[in-house]
Design a protein with these regions (language model features):
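Structural signature of hydrophobic alpha-helical transmembrane segments
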Residues: 12-26, 79-83, 136-141, 192-207, ...
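Hydrophobic mid-bilayer segments of alpha-helices in multi-pass membrane transport proteins
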Residues: 23-33, 40-62, 84-90, 230, ...
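Membrane-embedded alpha-helical segments and adjacent helix-loop junctions characteristic
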Residues: 69-152, 161, 382-468
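Juxtamembrane helix-boundary/capping and inter-helix hinge elements in multi-pass membrane proteins
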Residues: 98-102, 115-116, 149-158, 185-192, ...
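Alpha-helical transmembrane segments of multi-pass membrane proteins
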Residues: 118-130, 156-169, 190-210, 407-408, ...
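Re-entrant/interfacial helical elements at transmembrane boundaries that shape
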Residues: 140-148, 164, 177-188, 215-216, ...
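Juxtamembrane and boundary regions of transmembrane helices in multi-pass small-molecule transporters
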Residues: 172-283, 485-550
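Transmembrane helical segments that form the transport core of multi-pass membrane transport proteins
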Residues: 284, 288-443
């Protein structure tokens, strides 16, 4: 039932779409100013941005204060569950590995494959990170891989920044294809067409990201020295991603591509190694890194093997069925409800937006899968209770402020979405006519920056992209895919992602440094993707699949 209080979103509160867009951009500008100029901590910048967004929503958009408050609570809760929950569980698992001594063996095992930091970043940040993105998403891959790379000797800022950049190519198919499947259901277009177009558009990005990572670490010299290994990783990933996205759908491209790339690169490194070993730490002697016993290596990697097993189980339909309505574990669901104002917000088309959310404690929650992996690790490795208590205490202490930052950032995203500010920004770009082919991925980029999620950006702007395609007589699949592809390079500058990465590597309070590191690359990538979209639209329309309505 709709509440007595009603608010219909405004797309153009000032009577000029571009002036309204400038106003809607004000909270984002404020956030950038806080981080880049005033160098405030993440939670401080997030708090100020929420205040500015609330003022704009109340005075310019006319959104009632009670609905602004409900949007804040909804967003903050979403930030805590599942996002912060995933990060806390992931860091706890990592700390168990470190404090139990397993991580030292993991480092040794990676060193036996290659002691070269450039290739280690490709194996862990790009390949393993892509697998985790395909399985869990929500920032977990960056948290886990960045922490692993710091343990292997990379500086925290390097590890966090490089993992954020590596976590671009797989984002569109993250969390078992949810970004594309969700958009498909919303706009009424078969997911296979969108998945295929995304796979085709991602080819240049997926192929170039591993080389770009090495270039950032060691320049042109590094690319030349590691070229064979990086080519194997990039080609095997890109080809598999292209084939799987075009023939298998949206669910498996990340997982399959990551496994194939990791296997191909590891096997290749058995027969080839770079002439010069590159390290970002002071380690010079690699002679003591001899072959380790299989049992010892297996035991050390067991926490992450259990992580993979638990994630696979958690994604299975038969497992999820236990938590369906009326099933045996249905009681684990908790609803965050605003019954008195539910249905009070409607978009410009008159469709009601939900202010309620179901907090599913077990099913569909990757954080719970990671926690179960941690508990199984404690059992199988027989980790002493004092070590467990120390790991848990350190995790909760270190994650407290980052979790607040994440909550504030997602709260801002919900205020912007529910008030109509996000739609204002997208609508302004949609007025650019033929130039929209360039701005289509930019809208997705802005959407992911605002929400921290490619799924949210696709749900937010998918209908707008579809409408623009229809009005410009462009195949819908192109702009729908461009929204998702543009979004993947917005992930590295999303305040949510920045907060997660900083928390994982111990850079809490240094969010501005990491943001400056990734911003210029994100802008460069989105410009290139915009140009690539124009090339497809005007010169290569034949590669766009024919859209089939659902």
């Amino acid at each position: 039932m709709k509440g007595a209080l009603m608010y219909q979103q405004l797309t153009d509160p000032l009577g000029s779409i571009w002036l309204s867009a400038l106003l809607a951009f004000l909270p984002i500008f404020c956030f950038l100013l806080c981080l880049l100029v005033f160098k405030l901590k993440g939670y401080q910048a997030g708090f100020i941005t929420v205040i500015v967004a609330s003022v704009v929503a109340f005075y310019a958009y006319g959104m009632p204060f009670s609905l602004i408050g409900a949007s804040f609570v909804q967003g903050f809760a979403q930030g805590m569950w599942p996002i912060a929950w995933i990060i806390i569980a992931a860091i706890f698992l990592y700390k168990l590995s470190v404090k139990s001594g397993s991580f030292e063996v993991i480092k040794e095992s990676v060193m036996t494959i290659t002691p070269d930091h450039r290739i280690q970043v490709i194996l862990i940040g790009f390949c393993f990170g892509s697998f985790l993105e395909g399985a869990i998403g929500f920032g977990g891959p960056v948290a886990i891989t960045a922490a692993l790379l710091v343990g292997l000797g990379l500086k925290p800022l390097h590890a966090a920044g490089l993992c954020l950049i590596a976590n671009t190519a797989p984002v569109a198919f993250g969390a078992v294809g949810i970004p594309i499947i969700a958009m498909s259901n919303l706009v009424g277009v078969e997911q296979y067409e969108i998945s295929a177009m995304v796979g085709r558009m991602l080819v240049p990005l997926s192929l170039s990201v591993p080389f770009f990572i090495v270039f950032l670490m060691d320049g042109v010299k590094g690319v030349k020295e590691t070229f064979p290994a990086v080519l194997v990783a990039a080609l095997s990933f890109t080809i598999t991603q292209f084939i799987s996205s075009n023939y298998l759908g949206a669910e498996l491209p990340d997982i399959v591509s990551a496994v194939v790339s990791l296997a191909c690169t590891t096997i290749f490194l058995k027969f080839w190694s770079p002439k010069n070993i590159f390290r970002l730490d002071d380690l010079k002697d690699f002679s003591h890194h001899t072959q380790l016993e299989f049992g010892k290596v297996f035991k050390a990697w067991l926490p992450f093997i259990l992580l993979i097993v638990c994630i696979i189980v958690w994604t299975q339909p038969w497992f999820k069925a236990f938590f369906d309505k009326g099933a045996v574990f249905d009681y684990t669901k908790v609803a965050l409800s605003f019954n008195n104002i539910e249905g009070s917000i409607v978009d410009s088309a008159g469709k009601a937006l939900s202010l309620n959310m179901d907090i599913n404690l077990i099913a569909l929650q990757a954080g719970t899968a990671i926690l179960v992996a941690a508990l199984l690790t404690i059992f199988f490795l027989r980790i002493k209770s004092n070590i467990v208590e120390e790991a848990l205490g350190d995790t909760l202490k270190e994650m407290a402020m980052p979790c607040i930052t994440i909550g504030l950032v997602v709260a801002f995203a919900f205020i912007a979405k529910n008030s109509g500010m996000s739609t204002t920004l997208g609508t302004a770009f949609a007025t650019t006519g033929d130039a929209f082919s360039f701005f289509s991925p930019v809208i997705g980029w802005i959407g992911v920056f605002l929400t921290g999620s490619d799924t949210s950006a696709n749900l937010l702007f998918g209908p707008l992209q579809q409408a623009a395609a229809t009005s410009l007589a462009v195949p819908e699949a192109l702009f729908l895919a461009a929204n998702s592809v543009g979004g993947v390079v917005g992930k590295m500058i999303s305040p949510q992602s920045i907060a997660i990465a900083c928390a994982a590597v111990g850079l809490v309070g240094k969010e501005s440094d990491l943001f400056k590191f990734t911003l210029k690359y994100s802008v460069g990538f989105i410009i290139l993707i915009g140009i690539w979209t124009c090339i497809i639209a005007f010169l290569m329309p034949g590669i766009i699949p024919e859209v089939i309505a659902k």
